[in-house]
UniProtKB/Swiss-Prot annotation:
Gene source species: Pseudomonas syringae pv. tomato (strain ATCC BAA-871 / DC3000)
Disulfide bridge positions per record: none
Signal sequence bounds: 1-21
UniProt-annotated location(s): Periplasm
Any one GO cellular component localisation term in the record: outer membrane-bounded periplasmic space
InterPro entries (UniProt xref): LolA/LolB/LppX, OM_lipoprot_carrier_LolA-like, OM_lipoprot_carrier_LolA_Pbac
Name of the protein: Outer-membrane lipoprotein carrier protein
């Protein structure tokens, strides 16, 4: 559930391009994000406390489509599902047989998943952005411009122009690392993937 809440809420020496904050970094990140209108992938997520102790490890699969559609399915160790139809988000917990439905917060600082599936044309209004490149991997560090956020910093890493991993660090130093594998971009995704059907007999909570 921590991954879902946070998303609502990612020895060798190389020649490194120093981090710098300018319009080129913003434009490059925006271009990389916007060129993938859909994404599907497996993910593995690891959460560590401020001292580096492992708190949680989960795996699953995700599907994203612009603007604002996503399906984030955690399959182990505990199944959970988060689905956005662009207007509302449904959180399904099979163990509790409970669905929580809430309005989708369009602010990128409150819903990190929208960085991969939403409108990022005004990303510089929400974040200070710096970039560095090493060994064919481009890292973008995003620092929220306001304090009313779910995280203190977010790193997005791209390999060969495709999202490879992301890391979120919260106010107490906990790190959530998400690695994507088998990434496929700009392939057709069934509309039903982003429409959550409430299971019969499930408890429904509207927020």
């Amino acid at each position: 559930m921590r991954l879902i809440r946070m998303l609502l809420a990612t020895a060798l020496t190389f020649s490194v391009i120093p981090a710098h904050a300018d319009g080129k970094d913003v434009a490059r990140l925006t271009q990389l994000l916007e060129k993938s209108q859909t994404l599907t992938a497996r993910f593995s997520q690891l959460t560590l406390d401020g001292g580096g102790t492992q708190l949680q490890e989960t795996t699953g699969e995700m599907a994203l489509q612009r603007p604002g559609l996503f399906n984030w399915h955690t399959d182990a160790p505990q199944e959970q599902l988060m689905v956005s139809d662009g207007k509302k988000v449904s959180l399904w917990d099979p163990d509790l047989e409970q669905v929580t439905i809430k309005k989708l917060d369009q602010r990128l600082t409150q819903t990190p998943a929208l960085l991969l599936s939403g409108d990022v044309s005004k990303i510089s209004e929400s974040f200070d952005i710096t970039a560095k490149e090493a060994g064919g991997v481009i890292d973008f560090m995003l620092k929220p411009k306001t304090k009313d956020t779910l995280f203190d910093s977010l790193r997005l890493s791209f390999r060969n122009g495709i999202i490879n991993d992301m890391q979120l660090i919260d106010s107490v130093g906990q790190r959530t690392n998400i690695l994507f594998t088998g990434v496929k971009a700009n392939e057709s995704i069934a509309a039903s993937k982003f429409q959550f059907q409430i299971p019969k007999g499930a408890d429904v909570i509207q927020e």
